[in-house]
Amino acid sequence: MSSAVSTTAAPEARSILAGAAEGKVIATTEALSFWGGVDPATGKVIDVHHPLHGICLTGGVLFMPTSRGSCTGSGVLLDLILTGRAPSALVFCEAEDVLTLGALVAAEMFDKALPVIRLDAETFSRFSRAAHVSIDQNTIKADGVSLAIAPPATAHLDLNDDDRAMLVGRDGIAVRQAMRIIVAMAAQQGASALVDVTQGHIDGCIYASPANLTFAEKMADMGGKVRAPSTMNAISVDKANWRAQGVPEDFGDPAARLADAYVRMGCKPTFTCSPYLLDSAPSAGESIAWAESNAVIFANTVLGARTAKHPDFLDLCIAMTGRAPLSGVYIEENRRPQRIVDVALPAGIDDAFWPLVGYLAGKAAPDCIPLLRGLGAAKPSRDDLKALCAAFGTTSASPMLHIEGATPEAGLAPLETAETVTISLQDMAAAWSLLNDGPEEVQLVAIGSPHASLEECRALAAVFAGRKRRADVAVIVTAGQQVIDAAGKDGTLQSLKDSGVQVLPDLCWCSISEPVFPTKTRALMTNSGKYAHYGPGLSGRAVRFGSLADCVESALTGRAVSRLPVWLS
């Protein structure tokens, strides 16, 4: 693109959601997950690894390329809008769905407008350097420069008779509202049609903010029911035991009500962030509608199913109609690798290698689908891939990746424009240090982010080998009820209990709160790259990262291993 601004070129500014706003510019070149990255109670950035850490977004015009990470960011933004703590406008230079959906729901269901604008990269860079920006329906202004804003896209959307009937209210006001939101999102995504989905996975059941409950109960009260069979993500409490665990009523009650609202709408109370472990897991080529970032990435990458990374709230809308915008990775051409990442494979790796590589792969491909090369000889297990996908989702906005020799669609030809980058051993050592900046002394070991599989539970019991944790170090595993039941049948659960391990259903590390999260904890140890990234912001505690064996060592000694792993030394 020329450095000069042309009046004959395609519009440089596109309105995604119209509105008027002004404020100081808050700019970053790094995407941010609003869930786990922004405190809905204050509007401050809490992601300790992000350049904007500590900045309050309230009232500012936020310039960032796109969002990343959690699908729950839409709920956080909706809550910020409803409480008056949101940025005054969002300005992107790449496609973005999660925050856009939150702003769309605010406008559609609560009559609260927050402008969302997309600029070309050059204009984005120029305007992001301004001190103050103002936006109205037709223009964006900064530093004496005024740029016309093109209206929202109005591409033709081919609806079938059933779609149109839902849109005019045949199936009630809740379905009509759901279809209105789907059609609006399809327009901004450039979709020309909708696609049938066979199942959904609901992420909006996590009590990330009061807005999640407000939305769900409003849809339930309007008579909303899911049309596509839909599982539910982990929730924010142990549903049957939260009162006995001492969870305050003012948190436990709305968290439980939120889960109940989705069950009332026909969702299955699976309460797991690892739905790919359920018997209902989809097959290759199956079009589904999942939310929860790690699940979306695993479904596309490992199972070969097809799903966009649907934001919270859109997940329910699609489940209620059985229809999703036909865009993104629902289309085979859009599943091709857009970047090639050559990864160094050291000798003697352990399980910590995989989340570390996932974390770095997301940084290497923050906004596109990568093909990882060099890992096939290591023959990663499904749990290795699970850990990699979850960590990848913290640092990338992409809904999938490919791993040569390990994932089913890795043979898709990369785009002709795909560049090649590398992940070196030096990169791994630097990332290891980044995720291990806490003190050596730990009071908690956190396993199960995402929810642990039966094989992970067995592996943990095997490493403990009958030994018992230190009395002053809690060890907590979060897992889905189906996995816990299976672990109970084969003796694994009893072995873990004998070692002093607590196994909790329903909630996960991304939603756990005090006092279930041990209040005396100052630092914790985890084998999850995802929780190593989000944990400091979510819990306010320092985090150490390592292998499953490192976690058991910490449980036995109260100290994190203070060295690089042998395979990085």
UniProtKB/Swiss-Prot annotation:
Catalytic activity, EC: 4.2.1.171
Active site: 70
Name by which UniProt lists this protein: Cis-3-hydroxy-L-proline dehydratase
Cofactor: Fe(3+)
Organism expressing this protein natively: Agrobacterium fabrum (strain C58 / ATCC 33970)
InterPro entries from the UniProt entry: Acnase/IPM_dHydase_lsu_aba_1/3 (IPR015931), AcnX (IPR012047), PMDh-L-like_dom (IPR007506), PMDh-S-like_dom (IPR002840)
Reaction(s) the record says it catalyses: cis-3-hydroxy-L-proline = 1-pyrroline-2-carboxylate + H2O
Family: Belongs to the AcnX family.
Annotated control of activity: Inhibited by Zn(2+). Inhibited by pyrrole-2-carboxylate and its derivative 2-thiophenecarboxylate.
Keywords on record: Iron, Lyase
Keyword Iron: yes
GO MF annotation, one: lyase activity
Coiled coil spans: none
Function: Catalyzes the dehydration of cis-3-hydroxy-L-proline (c3LHyp) to Delta(1)-pyrroline-2-carboxylate (Pyr2C). No activity with L-proline, trans-4-hydroxy-L-proline (t4LHyp), cis-4-hydroxy-L-proline (c4LHyp), trans-3-hydroxy-L-proline (t3LHyp), D-proline, cis-4-hydroxy-D-proline (c4DHyp), trans-4-hydroxy-D-proline (t4DHyp) or L-serine as substrates. Involved in a degradation pathway that converts c3LHyp to L-proline, which would allow A.fabrum to grow on c3LHyp as a sole carbon source.
Subunit structure: Monomer.
Example GO BP: proline metabolic process
Protein's UniProt keywords contain Magnesium: no
Recorded name of the encoding gene: lhpI
